Every structure is written in C-alpha cells, then in structure tokens.
Amino acid sequence: MGFFGRLFGSKKKSDKAASSRDKRRWSFTTRSSNSSKRAPAVTSASVVEQNGLDADKHAIAVAAATAAVAEAALTAAHAAAEVVRLTSGNGGRNVGGGGNSSVFQIGRSNRRWAQENIAAMKIQSAFRGYLARRALRALKALVKLQALVRGHIVRKQTADMLRRMQTLVRLQSQARARASRSSHSSASFHSSTALLFPSSSSSPRSLHTRCVSNAEVSSLDHRGGSKRLDWQAEESENGDKILEVDTWKPHYHPKPLRSERNNESPRKRQQSLLGPRSTENSPQVGSSGSRRRTPFTPTSRSEYSWGCNNYYYSGYHPNYMANTESYKAKVRSQSAPKQRVEVSNETSGYKRSVQGQYYYYTAVEEESLDVGSAGYYGGGGGDSDRLNRNQSAKSRMHSSFLV
C-alpha cells in the first residue's frame, strides 16, 4: 500500500507538477497570444486613425505592424514546439486525459496563428491596394497635366503660324498693289510721251525705215538740186528783176576748170571741198527788188538727224528729263530755218549760211554732167552767157547744216 501510495502519490505530484508547468506554459502562450491579438488590434486602429497621413508614414506603420505580427507568430511557434517536445517526452507516463488536453491546446493555438496570419495578409493587401490606387490617381493627374501643356504649346504654335501666314498674305498684297501702280504709272507715262512725241509711239523698225526714207529723199534732192538750180537761174534771168551783188569778196576764189581739177591731187581737192565756212567768209548775194521765192523743202540732214535723235531721246526717260516746249522750239528753229534761194549771174555756187552756223560743202557729182554735151544744153551749143550759166549751175554746192 505504502509503495503503491507513494507511487501514486508521486504520480499525482508529478501530474500536479506537470499540470502546473503546463499552466505556466499555457499562461505564457495565452499571454503571447493575447499580446499578438492586441498588437493587430492596435495596428488596425493605428491604420484607421492614420488614413489621412502621408503614404510614407503609413508604410512605416504597416512594416512595424507586420514585424510585430511576425514576432508574435515566432514566439507562438517556439511555444508550440516546446509543448510538443514536452508532451512527447512524457508520453509514456501520461496515460490519462492530460495528453488530450495538450493536443487540443496546440490545435487552438495553431488556428489562432493561422487567423492572425490571414488578418495580416488582408491588412497588407488592403494597404497595397490603397497605395496602388493613389499611384494611379497621381499618374492620371500627370497625364492630364502633360495633355494640358501639349495643348497649350500646340495652340501657341498654331497662332504663330496663322500670324505668319497673315503677314505673308499682307506683304504679297502690298507687292501686287505696288506692281499694279508701277504698271499703271508706266502706261500713263508712255501715253503722255506718245501724245508729246508721236514718233516715240512707233516701233523701232518703223523709225528706222523712216530715217532711211528721209536719207533717200535727201539723196534724191541732192541729185535733182542742179536741175532745179538751172531752172531757177533761167527763170530769174528772164524776169525783170534787178539783182544786187555784194562786192565784198575778200575770200572768194573762183572754181577751177575741169581740166585743172583733174590735174589736182585727190587729197587737195578734198581739203578744198570740205573746208568749213561761215557767214564772214561766205559771199553774200542780194537783190533790191522783190525776189522770186521758191518753197524750201527741209528734207535734209537736219530732219534726218532729228528723226533719228527723236527715236533715241523720246519715250525712254522720265517726265522730268523730257524736252521742254522751249527747247523743242529752239531746236526746230535751228534745224529747219526759212531759206531763200538766191541766184546770181556770177558762178558762185554757194548758199548763204544762216545764223552764223558753220557747214561743209559737198560738190555735185561732175561725172554725171557733161558741159559740152548737146543733150545738156538743149541741142547745138549756145552763147557764152548760157555756157557760163550752165557751168555755174553745174558747180553749185548744197550744204548740210550741223545741228
């Protein structure tokens, strides 16, 4: 009895000691579990309170909460492992319901740990979702800001381009208006010059042909000058007119005969024919009575030169460089003066110079005339007066005025 009593008593004591140890251990576990339960509650409360704080602070708080949960889970795992070790070491001695109670406690602690882990994961997922939503909102705001900036830049570029196009169109219109004004002014200028100078409106070809025609007329006039002078000499001789001859002839030299001219050298003959003369050294022949006046045809070098000069000097200069009326009247008076053909019985063969101007003499072609020919004298010969008159008419010269 005593042995069995001690045995059972020791067993009871050992059971009591084991139960006291288990209680202590379970109290530790309960404390750790309570602390783990309280920590998530505190963390959840802190998360709810700090929703308005910055994201960095929230992240730090969540990291601290997860660290606390991990520490609690680690302590719970250590406690469970120690309980399992103790129960496995005393398994041969414990035959009653003590082992079942310890297993039940371990299952409860594992369930709690799993629930705590699930709660922590939910908290983390919720916080991560919050951060993702916030980042998405920030990204959307950034995209909107970029769109606004780009739209402002595009609108500014479009306005600048439109302003440049308007400036270009305005410049083009101004250039067109200036060109139209210049063309209108040039047309008005040409019309005014055509009114002032009719020859300027004709083409250069017509002007050239006109100059050539004037030259031909002047050459024809030179050819027929001798015959006209013969007729005028005969008519003046037949009329009852008294001619007065100026006796002042200091520089007069009679024309040599044809034989003498043939003996002269060509150079000397050219110098004698082309010598300049003026009113001072030219003979003056006049009449006291009324003289027979023949119309003067100004188809000479002066008209030819005036027509050609009019081609070059009219219509190609501005209005302020055009010839005035007084200048044109002066040129007209100098180029085509009123001439009176004066014939004397003497064989002078010269015309009077007008207004003291110098001019050159050109002899009539003597080869086309034959002094002794019967056709020239009208058949037969003639008396000495008629011979002298024909010879003087033959040797007359016509002048070309220098304008």
UniProtKB/Swiss-Prot annotation:
Annotated motif Nuclear localization signal, positions: 10-17
GO CC annotations on file: cytoplasm; cytoskeleton; nucleolus; plasma membrane
> In which residue ranges is the amino acid composition biased (Basic and acidic residues)?
257-267
Predominant location of this chain?
nucleus
Residue ranges occupied by any IQ domain in the UniProt entry:
116-144, 145-167
- Keyword Cytoplasm in record: yes
Q: Which SMART domains match?
A: IQ
Question: Which GO terms of the molecular function aspect are on file?
Answer: calmodulin binding
Statement: the UniProt record of this protein carries the keyword Nucleus = yes
Biological process (GO) annotations held by this record are: response to calcium ion
Please provide the record's keywords in A-Z order: Calmodulin-binding, Cell membrane, Cytoplasm, Cytoskeleton, Membrane, Nucleus, Repeat
Q: Where is this region: Disordered?
A: 1-43, 176-208, 242-301, 381-403
Q: Which domain of life is it from?
A: Eukaryota
Tell me the segments the record calls region Calmodulin-binding.
115-133
Q: Which InterPro entries match?
A: DUF4005, IQ_motif_EF-hand-BS, P-loop_NTPase
Q: Where is the composition biased (Polar residues)?
A: 27-43
**Family affiliation:** Belongs to the IQD family.
* Subunit-level organization: Binds to multiple calmodulin (CaM) in the presence of Ca(2+) and CaM-like proteins.
> What is the documented function of this protein?
May be involved in cooperative interactions with calmodulins or calmodulin-like proteins. Recruits calmodulin proteins to microtubules, thus being a potential scaffold in cellular signaling and trafficking. May associate with nucleic acids and regulate gene expression at the transcriptional or post-transcriptional level.
Q: What is this protein called?
A: Protein IQ-DOMAIN 23
Q: Which organism is it from?
A: Arabidopsis thaliana
What gene codes for this chain? IQD23
